Amino acid sequence: MAAPVAPSEPQASRAPQPPVCLLVLGMAGSGKTTFVQRLTGHLHNKGCPPYVINLDPAVHEVPFPANIDIRDTVKYKEVMKQYGLGPNGGIVTSLNLFATRFDQVMKFIEKAQNTFRYVLIDTPGQIEVFTWSASGTIITEALASSFPTVVIYVMDTSRSTNPVTFMSNMLYACSILYKTKLPFIVVMNKTDIIDHSFAVEWMQDFEAFQDALNQETTYVSNLTRSMSLVLDEFYSSLRVVGVSAVVGTGFDELCTQVTSAAEEYEREYRPEYERLKKSLANAQSNQQKEQLERLRKDMGSVALDPEAGKGNASPVLDPSDLILTRGTLDEEDEEADSDTDDIDHRVTEESREEPAFQNFMEESMAHWKRNK
């Protein structure tokens, strides 16, 4: 009889993967909102709908279903009226006010992390409003400290056919990469108007970009040539994807690049964030220890022994004792300071009255005898 086959060991249950946060940035008019709309629809069709957050307080209509909308919390026009601000100042202030409650947004994302694989964040149209503001830094670091975070820089391909404009986009991309220090994907949008192959060639082939620049003879072209010598090493290795938010092409390749960027985050960026978090915690702990030690030294320099003042002539009283005995002490001090405390005032007055009375009687008798 054959021996029974031992049941295979159950596979270890895999821990749920945290969602990947996609931070969509780009200059005004590059098609960020349309890109988020198309990417949301693409992920819905793939059976993994994303968790969408809108951070643009000035947009009139959002063409995608937003789970969290900044307009529900902050009224953009009311902020402009109350603080007397212009459009950009209103956006910055609205974003600052929203950033003060971003811990609640993080709680919502944590609750939904087992349901959603992607978190899409659509940022304001003005790129500098989010990238170079304190609120943008707070939001980016809050996301990156808890979830795999990837920056998607949406670039208008049709406006980058000029080498100078292309270099301006690359300068923006490198500045965001330097500021966020997160995995980075350059999304060349509007490929339905013009193919993005020329831009990819300029990014990866320095000589091809120099040949295109040689056709320009302006001062700006010379500046662009100098900048390309410095920045070529940075943007030549960036991930590049060409998409069309209108037609919907290129999003499968984008999802592949997002997966690769999330793996890079877990491999390189998360250990760095953990190290920074640990060093910050150690610095705070050391600061607290120094404050406690300083407080202990300050307390040690003060005499806390109640027996230490026994030998002094004037005893030390509590504030309550001083309040209750103030009148008594003042009277005692006045009596102690008097120079006539050793004289009996009653005896002195009687001794003065007797000779005065005798003098008065003698004068009266003498006056009576004269008149007689």
From Swiss-Prot:
Residues bearing the modification Phosphoserine: S301, S314, S338
TM stretches of this protein: none
Record SUPFAM superfamilies: P-loop containing nucleoside triphosphate hydrolases
Subcellular location per the Swiss-Prot or TrEMBL entry: Cytoplasm; Nucleus
Coiled-coil zones: none
Main location: cytoplasm
Pfam families assigned to the protein according to its UniProt record, in alphabetical order: ATP_bind_1
Start-end of Acidic residues biased regions: 330-342
Ranges where the record places region Disordered: 303-372
Positions of the record's site feature: Stabilizes the phosphate intermediate: N88
GO molecular function, one term: GTPase activity
Motif Gly-Pro-Asn (GPN)-loop positions after renumbering to this chain: 86-88
Residue numbers carrying N-acetylalanine: A2
An annotated GO cellular component: nucleoplasm
Residues noted as binding GTP in the record, renumbered to the chain: G29, S30, G31, K32, T33, T34, N189, K190, T191, D192
Keywords tagged on the record: Acetylation, Cytoplasm, GTP-binding, Hydrolase, Nucleotide-binding, Nucleus, Phosphoprotein
Basic and acidic residues biased stretches: 343-355
InterPro entries documented for this protein: AAA+_ATPase, Gpn, Gpn1/Npa3/XAB1, P-loop_NTPase
Positions of modified residues (Phosphothreonine): T328, T340
EC number(s) from the headed UniProt entry: 3.6.5.-
Family to which this protein belongs: Belongs to the GPN-loop GTPase family.
Subunit structure: Heterodimer with GPN3. Binds to RNA polymerase II (RNAPII). Interacts directly with RNAPII subunits RPB4 and RPB7 and the CTD of RPB1. Interacts with XPA.
Record function comment: Small GTPase required for proper nuclear import of RNA polymerase II (RNAPII). May act at an RNAP assembly step prior to nuclear import. Forms an interface between the RNA polymerase II enzyme and chaperone/scaffolding proteins, suggesting that it is required to connect RNA polymerase II to regulators of protein complex formation. May be involved in nuclear localization of XPA.
Name by which UniProt lists this protein: GPN-loop GTPase 1
Species of provenance: Mus musculus (Mouse)
